[in-house]
Amino acid sequence: MKKHGILNSHIAKLLADLGHTDTIVIADAGLPVPPGVPKIDLALTLGTPGFREVTKLIADEMVVEKVTAAQEIESVNPGQAAFLKAEFSNQKIDYIPHEAFKKATSQAKAVIRTGEATPYANCILHAGVIF
């Protein structure tokens, strides 16, 4: 049994298998998952686990080169937008329209669904390299 870090075997394998520029999505409870993209469903109840908690844990174990979020998050959910800016202060954050964001999720290696119940609390994490 692992002693540290993410214990969820699906997420641990996903992170270990990522290559440079691969993407994963951290999603709120309502984001649709495109056909063919694996979903790792962590949602237990509305709000649990939350977007911030899951995003922080993933970011601690992943080399993140850049982040993509829906541009609507800045006006509709400024608290989550501020969290993303603080958490990824050393990475570029691209803001795109929500419809384009949903289309971009079709290229992800997986969608990790949280129980988050606030609007536009989603992000695409683009893998970097450790060297």
Swiss-Prot record:
Catalytic activity line of the entry: beta-D-ribopyranose = beta-D-ribofuranose
GO biological process terms, semicolon-separated: D-ribose catabolic process
Key word Cytoplasm present: yes
MF terms in GO: D-ribose pyranase activity; intramolecular lyase activity; monosaccharide binding
E.C. numbers: 5.4.99.62
Pathway in which the depicted protein is active: Carbohydrate metabolism; D-ribose degradation; D-ribose 5-phosphate from beta-D-ribopyranose: step 1/2
Active site residues of this protein: H20 (proton donor)
Coiled coil, from the record: none
Enzyme class: isomerase
GO cellular component terms, semicolon-separated: cytosol
Isomerase keyword on record: yes
Keywords: Carbohydrate metabolism, Cytoplasm, Isomerase
Principal location listed in the UniProt entry: cytoplasm
Protein's cellular compartments: Cytoplasm
Known partners and oligomeric status: Homodecamer.
NCBIfam families assigned: PRK11797.1
PANTHER family in alphabetical order: D-RIBOSE PYRANASE
Family the entry assigns: Belongs to the RbsD / FucU family. RbsD subfamily.
Listed name of the protein: D-ribose pyranase
